[in-house]
A protein has these predicted regions:
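Extracellular beta-strand/beta-solenoid scaffold signature
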Residues: 1-9, 26-34, 52-58
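Active-site neighborhood of glycoside hydrolase catalytic domains
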Residues: 1-7, 11-22, 38
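Acidic, glycine- and Ser/Thr-rich low-complexity intrinsically disordered tracts
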Residues: 13-18, 36-173
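Alpha-helical context
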Residues: 23-24, 46
Length: 173
């Protein structure tokens, strides 16, 4: 649940984006802001689920990537799943997501943010491996986990920046 870009590629080469659940970003689910002259990432075995906005944001169809064995699903019947103007079929004809599906993963309880998929057949088709998403993130010793924590000053600075952008009604940052 973020404003946009549940996955956002900025810099990087041959990143691996695998076995994730991206759910309910407000504006766009996937985006890339920097086009580089190499394979930026592989996007496989992911579930992208949303109820508002669009599937793809800026540059998704132009960034160098390979995408396959994913599930895309939009609960809003008025929204058409497309890849920046390309239908799913056209996207596949370009060599992307040839083994992917538009299908409901049937999450356990969306309202309670329990994103455990119940559609086991779909999980097999896309090679998705179940995991306890509540344990995702930095793990290890207490000292190691503390390295990932933001200081109160950093949190306050971030909150201030967001507020300033919202007051200026800046939508693309």
């Amino acid at each position: 649940n973020c404003k946009s870009g549940g996955y956002h590629q900025h810099y990087g080469k041959e990143n691996i984006i695998k076995n994730n659940i991206f759910a309910n970003q407000i504006r766009t689910q996937l985006e890339a802001s920097r086009i580089e002259q190499h394979l930026s990432f592989n996007f496989t075995n992911n579930i992208v689920y949303y109820n508002s906005g669009s599937l793809c944001g800026i540059n998704w169809k132009n960034v160098g990537h390979k995408s396959d064995y994913n599930c895309y699903y939009c609960t809003n019947a008025s929204e058409k799943i497309d890849f920046q103007g390309l239908s799913f079929s056209e996207w596949q004809h370009k060599g992307q997501d040839t083994h992917s599906f538009i299908e409901d993963p049937i999450f356990t309880d969306i309202q309670a943010e329990n994103f455990t998929p119940k559609n086991k057949e779909l999980l097999k088709k896309i090679g998705f491996r179940m995991f306890d998403y509540s344990k995702a993130g930095v793990y290890g010793s207490k000292k190691w986990k503390q390295k990932a924590e933001l200081s109160n000053e950093m949190k306050a600075a971030f909150d201030k920046l967001v507020k300033e952008y919202e007051e200026q009604n800046i939508t693309d940052w």
